[in-house]
Amino acid sequence: MPDLYIIGGPNGAGKTTTALRVFPRLGVSSFINADIIAQGMSPLDVESAARAAGRFMLQEMEAHLARGADFALETTLASRTLAPFVRRCQSAGYRFILIYVWLEDADLAVSRVARRVRAGGHNIPDEVVRRRYERGLKNFFEIYSPLADSWTVLDNTGKSAVFVAQGGRELATDVMLLETWQAMQGADND
């Protein structure tokens, strides 16, 4: 059974860093990431390559699905548009594994993106980071975690990520950090 891994979370949460550490340990060799693709297309002006990188990412996703190959991708989960693709993958026999990297608030996400920009990384406007933070968390609970065969939540607010909870469509939810889990659910209801 092929696997589709999605690592989601707000901008600045450390999704790419986490993915590059975790996916090799899971045996995942194909990580489709629009930001990395854009850096390869135009390393001196990543923002100008973002649209083309997004199109290339979609082509790669479809190609992996057509081959029945394992793959992973990164997203903020701020859009609902990925859900039909996930369902198509599941209909084709894929197992959907979701990893959500959480930050305690949108202010921290904005701060992390600003730090990334100072270090030479790509920028995302503050209002976009804030909007994606709220929508991504809402969509995690309402759309993507209910679809996931298994999901894991990591809190990357501190210096290193810690496990918060895990579960899945046919799995009981196991909460390791109750206060953090409740904070996530409360933030989703704001």
Language model regions located:
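Conserved substrate/cofactor phosphate-moiety recognition/catalytic segment
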Residues: 19-69
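The Walker A (P-loop) glycine that initiates the GxxxxGKT/S ATP-binding motif of P-loop NTPases
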Residues: 6-9, 75
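Walker A (P-loop) phosphate-binding loop of P-loop NTPases
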Residues: 12
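NTP-dependent small-molecule kinase module
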Residues: 142-190
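Conserved lysine of the Walker
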Residues: 15
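Pre-Walker A (Motif I) flank of P-loop NTPase domains
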Residues: 1-4, 67-69
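A glycine- and Lys/Arg-enriched "phosphate-lid" helix/loop adjacent to the NTP-binding pocket
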Residues: 94-140
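Glycine-rich phosphate-binding loop used to anchor ATP phosphates in small-molecule kinases
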Residues: 49-103, 136, 140, 152
